Amino acid sequence: FILGASKSGKSSLEKVLGQSPKVQSFYECLRPDSQIYSNPKKPDQPVNSALRRDNLSISDLFYGNENLLTSDGIEVVTCSNPFAIHSIITLAEALPNASFVFMSRNPMDVAADIFTTEYNASNYYAYDPYSIMEYINWYQDFWDILKEKIPESTLTINFECLMKTPHKIAEQLEVFLSTDIELT
């Protein structure tokens, strides 16, 4: 799962990794019918706690069949859906092999990109500089806590390094994920 504030480089990382025949990028496509995700639009709707004790399959989360992906040589799937952050604990418990990658980018660059983006809906924070910085800081604070709780499942990737040396970032991910990504 690729995490980070809007405009932090999550999609850029997925595009780089998507060059590999061993990686399936699901981008922001999560199954809306999966009971594992709490609905941010209905915060009082609880996550199905029974799923927290069970292992999940790829098809429980995405529109993909784990057996078909495996037979096609896929070893890594990625997701950059921003709502996944609301269910990190559930994901970490129900997917023992899940990894969480945080895209780190200069906060002022992120803020400038957010401020100049005209969003179609929501993202009301994007039109006030103070709110933008609160939003960016919240992601960083969240990531710092997550790294403390599950350090073996977390990795921080620097956006600027990704742009300059994508193959080095791929090598870093190969070590972290214990797999050969084989970028083309």
Task: Outline where the language-model segments fall.
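PAPS-dependent sulfotransferase catalytic core
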Residues: F1-L61
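PAPS-dependent sulfotransferase catalytic domain
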Residues: V23, L30-P32, Y37-D44, D72-T184
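Hydrophobic residues within well-ordered alpha-helices
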Residues: F62-Y63, Y139
